[in-house]
Regions:
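Exported/periplasmic ABC-transporter solute-binding proteins
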Residues: 1-211
Length: 211
């Protein structure tokens, strides 16, 4: 059975032995690697999104960090209109938020105007607010928002896989090191890490890594 409780909860369940495989949308931390083995099955770009009415089309990672930490507060400072920036993000414990804050080096420093509990809510909020900036899994981005290029690189399957789009995170299977999985769990693990799963992973919008 699959229980979607968030990355940190899934990792802790794997550590505690209350599940066979913990699923995470962030890399394991060093202390978690003390008891768990990390297997990357896919990559996901985290798109930086704005309202389609926003004339800004590109930001650097540094500018994104400065916006989210409150150092830059007006769109005019990055080539946009004279409007106060509304910073939209995910709730604490979200793998997307963890990935975004890790890559932009803004952990514990982000000043969010709104912290929302789902990617869909972030997209809807940004779509309805011309001042807003948000982040969302590339696979979830809709035409109702505009995904920015980051350092001149557009988020796509190709740029995520070749590493030129830098705001990306891994999807991880976390298993207890040195412990055998049950027959059913091992069968799932073998399938998920094989090229046979690539079509399913791609259909879900992530970038498969198995050859």
């Amino acid at each position: 059975t699959y229980n979607p409780t968030g990355s940190s909860t899934g990792i802790q369940a794997a550590i505690d032995g209350t599940c066979d495989i913990g699923l995470s949308s962030r890399a394991l931390k060093d202390e978690e690697k003390a008891t768990l083995t990390e297997t990357i099955v896919a990559l996901d770009g985290i798109a930086i999104i704005v309202n389609p009415a926003n004339p800004v089309s590109d930001l650097s990672v540094e500018q994104i960090a400065q916006i989210y930490t409150g150092e830059i507060t007006n769109w005019k400072d990055v080539g946009g209109d004279d409007l106060e920036i509304s910073r939209i993000g995910r709730e604490a414990g979200s793998g997307t938020r963890d990935g975004f804050e890790t890559i932009t080096d803004t952990k514990e420093a982000c000043k969010y105007n709104q912290e929302l509990t789902s990617t869909g809510d972030v997209i809807t909020t940004v779509a309805g607010n011309p001042n807003a900036i948000g982040y969302a899994s590339l696979s979830a981005v809709k035409d109702s928002v505009k995904a920015l290029t980051v350092g001149g690189v557009a988020p796509s399957e190709e740029t995520v896989l070749d590493g030129t789009y830098t705001i990306q995170r891994p999807f991880v299977l976390a298993t207890r090191t040195g412990e055998a999985l049950s027959e059913a769990a091992q069968a799932f693990f073998d399938f998920a890490t094989s090229a046979d799963a690539n079509e399913i992973i791609a259909a879900a919008g992530a970038v498969p890594v198995a050859k």
